[in-house]
């Protein structure tokens, strides 16, 4: 009887230990690590799980013919109020879908197409050469830096990429450093508040969450231009 009680106690302690390990949350000074969404990396920032980066294998989806209708990209670009001599950074440029639509509007300026995937930059370079476009330059960034010169950028565009930054604190600090003092950051993310937007939850972001994270990085929300079908068009400026 005594042995049975000891055995039962041992099993109970073991099960409690397993449960504790399964639910364990690791926290650093910046980020939290725990299991979450299947499409997330298990790393959290300010209550938001970071999503996996879409690989270059999805490049055809970026160039899909329905994209203008779904996202109204032409209106997004109008929202940026581009000037001919401006220097623009398209962060997470992917296939160059936005960069090549911006380039003709800054004919005296330049568009930096920044991505961490060399395959994406290779595709941009091929398009650039085939269309003889001279004011788009590719930049290989890293998970922590956009590798752009300090105070060189008038406007930054990030379309559905910020939520995939593995190191959002470091990346936004790098972007902020690259922006001119009066520069603007256009943060485009699928609206988490709108359940009708047919995108997975982890690939969406609410205005409240975006403002929370940008505020921590030293940015203020100037305005949220609410004229896109699925996305927020949030304009941030340095504090």
Where are these regions (language model features)?
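Bacterial N-terminal signal peptides
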Residues: 8-16
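Class I SAM-dependent transferase core
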Residues: 24-81, 87
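Class I SAM-dependent methyltransferase SAM/SAH-binding core
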Residues: 89, 93-145
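A short acidic, Gly/Pro-enriched loop at the edge of an enzyme's catalytic core
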Residues: 146-155
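A short SAM/SAH-binding and catalytic strip from SAM-dependent methyltransferases
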Residues: 154-168
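A short glycine-rich, Lys/Arg-flanked "PGG" loop and its adjoining helix->strand segment in the class I
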Residues: 169-184
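Conserved class I S-adenosyl-L-methionine
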Residues: 186-211
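Core SAM-dependent methyltransferase catalytic element
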Residues: 223-239
């Amino acid at each position: 009887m005594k042995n049975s009680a000891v055995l039962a106690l041992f099993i109970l302690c073991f099960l409690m230990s397993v449960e504790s390990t399964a639910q364990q949350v690791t926290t650093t000074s910046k980020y939290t690590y725990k299991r979450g969404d299947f499409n997330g990396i298990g790393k959290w920032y300010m209550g938001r799980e970071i999503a996996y980066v879409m690989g270059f294998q999805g490049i055809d989806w970026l160039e899909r013919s329905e994209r203008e209708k779904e996202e109204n990209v032409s209106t997004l670009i109008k929202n940026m109020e581009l000037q001919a001599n401006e220097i623009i950074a398209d962060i997470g440029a992917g296939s160059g879908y936005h960069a090549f639509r911006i380039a003709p509007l800054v004919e005296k300026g330049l568009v930096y197409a920044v991505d961490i995937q060399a395959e994406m930059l290779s595709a941009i370079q091929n398009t650039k050469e085939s269309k003889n476009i001279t004011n788009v330059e590719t930049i290989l960034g890293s998970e922590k830096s956009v590798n752009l010169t300090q105070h060189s950028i008038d406007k930054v565009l990030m379309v559905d990429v910020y939520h995939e930054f593995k190191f959002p604190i470091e990346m936004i600090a790098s972007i902020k450093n690259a922006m001119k003092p009066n520069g603007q950051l256009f943060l485009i993310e699928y609206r988490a508040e709108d359940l009708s937007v047919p995108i997975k939850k982890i690939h969406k972001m609410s205005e409240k969450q975006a403002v929370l994270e940008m505020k921590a990085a030293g940015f203020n929300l100037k305005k949220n231009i609410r004229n896109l079908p699925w996305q927020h068009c949030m304009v941030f400026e340095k504090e």
